[in-house]
Design a protein with these regions (language model features):
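Conserved catalytic or regulatory cores that recognize and/or transform ribose-phosphate-containing ligands
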Residues: 1-187
């Protein structure tokens, strides 16, 4: 089963589930998180679920709210939700879309979360991070430099031409990681 949790939802997350955080631009960016989630759910439902592993559930954590509430404390709750979900994730993904926004908060979050994954999963952290850039993203070079510096080795940022193609590449990489991680035995 694939479940999508959207901010600010809080649900019990089964320890055996593979948890994936969909980080990346939200404001002035396409709704790529929903495209990824919908494609993964469709792919999972179209295939034999055993292709994804042996009964391991998948939880996609989407920080994009259906609608933003302009009320006191909304930003605080959003950021707390994101920190909580990122701390629980097994796979961290970040997508940088082309368009109006430079996504400066995402640039900060990228380095911070590479470090977090290195500390949480010291033996296999590189197999738990997916980073993709639309070639139209204004700061592609900054993303590549930051990931190289944060990881002490080439992490492998995918830079793909075109919004649809880059989202498809991000989907394929996440799907590949999920097929690997849902097959791993529970520890």
């Amino acid at each position: 089963m694939i479940e999508v949790i959207t901010a600010p939802e809080h649900k019990y997350l089964y320890p055996s589930a593979v948890k994936v955080f969909l980080a990346g631009g939200i404001q002035k960016c396409p709704e790529w998180q929903k495209q990824i989630a919908d494609a993964l759910v469709k792919d999972y439902n179209d295939l034999n679920p055993l292709d994804y592993g042996f009964g391991r559930d998948i939880v996609l954590m989407n920080p994009r709210r259906a609608e933003w509430l302009n009320e006191p404390g909304a930003a605080q709750k959003q950021i707390e939700w994101e920190f909580d979900m990122i701390e629980k994730c097994d796979i961290f993904t970040m997508y940088f879309s082309g368009g109006e926004s430079d996504q400066p908060i995402c640039m900060y979050e990228l380095g911070r979360n590479i470090e977090r994954m290195k500390q949480k999963f010291p033996n296999d952290w590189m197999n738990r991070i997916v980073i993709t850039c639309d070639s139209d993203y204004k700061r592609v070079n900054d993303v590549v430099i930051q990931t190289d510096l944060a990881s002490d080795q080439r992490l492998g940022v995918s830079v793909v031409e075109g919004k649809d193609e880059s989202i498809k590449e991000h989907f394929e990489k996440i799907k590949s990681y999920l097929k690997t991680w849902t097959r791993k035995p529970l520890t």
